[in-house]
A protein has these predicted regions:
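Helix-rich interaction surfaces within compact, conserved domain-sized segments
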Residues: 35, 42-91
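Phosphate-interacting basic helix/loop segments used at nucleotide- and nucleic-acid interfaces
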Residues: 1-7
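Sequence-level motif detector for i,i+2 pairs with an aromatic at +2
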Residues: 2, 15, 69-72
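Hydrophobic/aromatic-rich, well-ordered segments within soluble, folded domains that form packed cores
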Residues: 7-39, 45, 74-79
Length: 91
């Protein structure tokens, strides 16, 4: 019943933003970037532009984000069953 979670890239412990890769197996991957909504509340935004993208597209997006911001944290969750539910709103 465990869901494997890995820190793929360690960012700045005080100010690094988070990119979350939810690996849904054959269904694809959801890539979510940590953002703030209009009220300043923490939220998530689809990084790949779509709800699910290919693993290759997810990795390309993540690499591009790390190149832009090396302080970024990247966390990957392997969840082909879709059990993990993101906390917070997706904008």
């Amino acid at each position: 019943n465990c869901i494997p979670i890995m820190i793929r890239h360690k960012g700045d412990p005080d100010s690094g933003a988070i990119v979350l890769k939810l690996d849904r197996g054959e269904s694809g991957c959801a890539v979510l970037s940590q953002v703030r909504d209009a009220d300043g509340v923490q939220a998530w935004m689809h990084g790949g532009g779509a709800e699910l993208v290919t693993d290759s597209d997810a990795e390309t997006y993540i690499k591009r984000q790390i190149d832009r911001d090396p302080d970024l944290w990247v966390i990957e969750i392997e969840d082909p069953g879709g059990r993990y539910k993101i906390d917070g709103n997706i904008v």
